[in-house]
Amino acid sequence: YGGISIGKEALKRFKEENFPNAVHISGYGNTLFGLCLEIDASPAYDLDYFPLGPRMIVQVVETDNGNVPSSERLSKVVNYEEEGQVVFHRLDESFFIPNMFERDRAVRIPPTSTAIEYGITQDGVRNPSLLENSKQVVKTGLY
């Protein structure tokens, strides 16, 4: 949420108590991959993000055998509504980045009807946050 993960209770407090009249715009991504936007505000205070356009692909892969990047893990995509490690792929003519394993975990979600109306047909991610074993060594925030 603006560069850091946020829990449902904190998000609810931000939207309803701290900043009830503000327009909340949330995004998820990084400088290399680009930005996935929150298309719909969730009544359950989930943060659902979808990549814009076919050149950006998000996968969520199993973490059963750890989170070390490997080509065999790329084929182990979790089912919808299951959590795993986020992997980005950016497929531009000028910027080709396949198989970028992130230090984040998230829930894999199918495109919503609103996302499809905007032409977004790729999977998205829900409630991204740091992988458990990354919390000890990773600084969070905007940098």
Question: What is the predicted role of each segment?
Answer:
Residues Y1-Y143:
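Active-site glycine/GP-rich loop and adjacent strand/helix microenvironment
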